[in-house]
Design a protein with these regions (language model features):
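Non-catalytic, surface beta->alpha helical segment in thiol-disulfide oxidoreductase systems
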Residues: 19-21, 54-90
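Solvent-exposed coil/turn segments that connect beta secondary-structure elements
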Residues: 7-8, 41-42, 64-65
């Protein structure tokens, strides 16, 4: 599972979405290996609290049982983000 937390006021979130989340390699890898969940921290207060989200963007990778594997904070370039995904998924 991949959880992406964003805020409508977050410049880094907008950059991440415009650059990284439009990259076909990133999208293909996420769609192939993860269930995708997006959290709007301005609107979804319960989920924001449950996932302990303090900054945006936050990217959280969970195993099938819901245990956190990795948490990334802030903007990542396409290649850096793919490198992080590939460390999790072989």
């Amino acid at each position: 599972m991949f959880v992406y937390a964003r805020s409508k006021y977050c410049g880094a979130c907008k950059q991440f979405e415009a650059e990284t989340f439009t990259n076909s390699s990133v999208i293909d890898k996420l769609n192939k290996d993860f269930i995708l969940i997006s959290i709007d921290v301005d609107e979804q207060k319960t989920e924001t609290r449950d996932f302990r989200i303090r900054v945006t963007p936050t990217e959280i990778f969970l195993d099938p049982k819901g245990t956190e594997i990795k948490r990334l904070l802030g903007y990542r370039t396409n290649q850096t983000f793919l490198d992080e995904i590939n460390k999790i998924v072989i």
